[in-house]
Amino acid sequence: LLRSDQLTELTMKVALVGLEHHMRFDLTGYPRMGDQWEIGVMSRIVSIADCYDAMTSRRTYETDRLIPHRVMLHMLGRSGKNFDPVLMRLFVCLMGLYPVGSLVRLTRGDLAMVVATDPTDLVRPVVRLLRTAQEQIIPPSELQLVNLNDRGFWPEAELPIREALDPEVFGLDLAPYLL
């Protein structure tokens, strides 16, 4: 496929990622390369990103998609088997258990969208309020941010997020709130 005089270090790394990114951390998956094979770090990173993207995106061949929070929990549960546990922990710290753009219901009933994550406290992101507990809609032009890590706002013993939700169920387009 490639002539040896055209192979650079970069093209070899790219080809290796193409070969390895469906291999699991425990060397199951495909292609089967044997028990002594060492999956490259770039392939392990792409494997995590590819899985997250596939599970959270609507595909032509797959009508269902999962909300990001459920995907993160699923992938964490496969850490050490499907995914490199160190890289998986880093991915969760970067993305958050409730990734930016996630729709959540707070324990007091408000609907909010995650706008920033805190790698030191994965269950207390910064959110933008969208609807109050009394179902009052907060328009995109009004910016109401709440740092769920603010212990004065949320008592430490209380988890601020009751559940992650699918915006389509509520007929919400979150894009205007991201701008």
Question: How would you label these PLM feature ranges?
Answer:
Residues 1-179:
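Histidine- and acidic-residue-rich, metal-dependent catalytic cores
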